[in-house]
C-alpha cells in the first residue's frame, strides 16, 4: 500500500511540474515577449530612417454608386506592411516564438488615409483587432473598411455608361523622405462579390508623386472601372415609353367616322406626352444635373415626345383634308396627291374593271375621305418606323454589351493571378 501511494504521488508531482514547465515555455514566454516589446518601443515615434510601406487592397464588394451625389461606396480589405527595428527580437531568447500580436493602440502605425474619401467606416473598431508582428520587426496591419469616395460621373451615354473611380491612399503628415508608399500588385479579387447594377470591368493601380508645401508625397491610386447593366432601365423606362408612344400614334391616325369628330384625338396626344414626361423625370432624378452632357436615355425620351407632338399637330391637317370634301362638293383632290397616296393606281384598276369614270361613281366627299384615310395610314406607318428605329438600336446596344461575361472572365483571370500572392 505504501509503495502504491508513493508511486501515485510521484506521478502527480511529475505531471504538475511538466504542466508548469509547458505553461512557462509557451504562455509565459509570450507574455514576457509582449512586455519586452512594449518597453523598448515608443508608439509616438516612427522607426528610424525612411519607412518603406507595402500597401495592398482586396476589393470585396462595390456597395453602390450614387450618381446624383457623384460618389462610390466600396468594401475593401487593406493590408499594410512595414519594418520597425524596435519590434524585433531574438527567437532563441523567447523559446522559438517567431510571431506575436500586439494591440493596435500600443504601437506606431502610419497615418495612411484616403484623400478623396467622404466617409470612412472601420469595421473592426469595436473588435480591437491585434496587429501581427514578426521577430524580424516586420509589422502586418490588416483590416476591412468601407470607403465612400468622390467619383466624377459621366452621364452622356446613360444607361450604357462606364465609370472609372479612384481610391487615393497617401500619408497625411509624412513626406516621401520619411514614408515611401508602394504597392506590390494590383487589387486582389479573390473574395469579390458582384454588384447587381454595376459590372466590374477592370481594376488597376499606379504609384504617383506630387508636391505639397515644398515636400514630395508618394501616393497609391487604385482605379476601379465599372459598367452599368442597362437591361433594367430598358425594361422599366424604354419599353413603357415605346408602348405609350405607339398606342398614341395608332390612336391619332386610326380611321374615324364620316362626321369628322377628331377633337378627342388631341386629348389622347396630350395625355401621351404628359405620361412620357413623367417617365423622363424618373431618369432626371437618377443622374447628375449637368448642362454639359444630356443622358442618351433622356435624348431618346425627348425624341419620342417630339414625335408624338408632331403627330398630334398633323392630326389637325388630316382633319382639314377630311372636312374639305364636305365644304367643296365639286373640287376633286389634285392628281399629284392621288399619285403620292397611290389612290390613282387603285382607281385606274377600278376603271378598267367597271368601265366607268371615277367621278361618276364617287362623290367629292368620298374622294377627300379616301385621301385622309390614306394619309392616316401613311403617317402612322412613318411615325412608328421612326420611333421603332432608335428603340431597336437601344436594345441592340444592350445585347452587344455583354458585361456579365466580361466580369466573369475578369474575375476568373484575377483569381488565377491572386493565387501567386497567397
Curated annotation (Swiss-Prot):
Extracellular compartment residues: 21-233
UniProt GO cellular component terms: acetylcholine-gated channel complex; neuron projection; plasma membrane; postsynapse; synapse
Annotated signal sequence range: 1-20
S-S bridge residues: 151-165
Changes seen on gene knockout: No visible phenotype. Mutants exhibit normal posterior body contractions.
Gene Ontology biological process terms, A to Z: chemical synaptic transmission; monoatomic ion transmembrane transport; regulation of membrane potential
Membrane topology: Multi-pass membrane protein
Keywords: Disulfide bond, Ion channel, Ion transport, Membrane, Receptor, Signal, Transmembrane, Transmembrane helix, Transport
Side of membrane Cytoplasmic, spans: 315-378
Entry keyword annotation includes Transmembrane: yes
Quaternary structure note: The functional channel is a hetero-oligomer of pbo-5 and pbo-6.
Assigned protein family: Belongs to the ligand-gated ion channel (TC 1.A.9) family. Acetylcholine receptor (TC 1.A.9.1) subfamily.
Name listed for the protein in its UniProt record: Proton-gated ion channel subunit pbo-6
